[in-house]
Amino acid sequence: MAKGQSLQDPYLNALRRERIPVSIYLVNGIKLQGQIESFDQFVILLKNTVSQMVYKHAISTVVPARSVSHNNGGAAHTQQSPAVEAVADKAE
C-alpha cells in the first residue's frame, strides 16, 4: 500500500461504513453531495439520487457533514468538519 493511501483509505472507509453525508469539491469548483458508496485506488462512487463515479484526481476536498472517527494504523483519530467546529465555537 502506498504511504499516501494509508490515511485516505481508513478515512473514506469510515465515511462509507457510517454512511456520513459528504460534500466533495472538485478542482474545477463544482460541489457534489451524497454518501460514499464505494471507492478504490482511482475513483469514489458517490450516491445521492443517482450514483456518480468521481475520479480522485478531480477531487480537491472531501468535507463530512459531521465528525468522523477513523482508525489509521491502530491509532484512532477523530476529525470534525469545519462547519461542526464553527457551530461548536459559537456555542461556547
Curated annotation (Swiss-Prot):
Composition bias, Polar residues: 69-82
Pfam families given in the database record: Hfq (PF17209)
SUPFAM superfamilies in the cross-refs: Sm-like ribonucleoproteins
Span list, region Disordered: 69-92
Annotated CDD domains: Hfq
Cellular component annotations (GO), alphabetically ordered: cytosol
GO biological process: regulation of DNA-templated transcription; regulation of RNA stability; regulation of translation, ncRNA-mediated
InterPro entries cross-referenced by the UniProt entry: Hfq, LSM_dom_sf, Sm
Cross-referenced PROSITE patterns: SM
Disulfide bond residue pairs: none
MF annotations from Gene Ontology: RNA binding
Domain Sm residues, every copy: 9-68
Keywords, comma-separated and alphabetical: RNA-binding, Stress response
Coiled-coil positions: none
Ranges that cross the membrane: none
Subunit and interaction comment: Homohexamer.
UniProt similarity note: Belongs to the Hfq family.
Function according to Swiss-Prot or TrEMBL: RNA chaperone that binds small regulatory RNA (sRNAs) and mRNAs to facilitate mRNA translational regulation in response to envelope stress, environmental stress and changes in metabolite concentrations. Also binds with high specificity to tRNAs.
Protein name per its UniProtKB record: RNA-binding protein Hfq
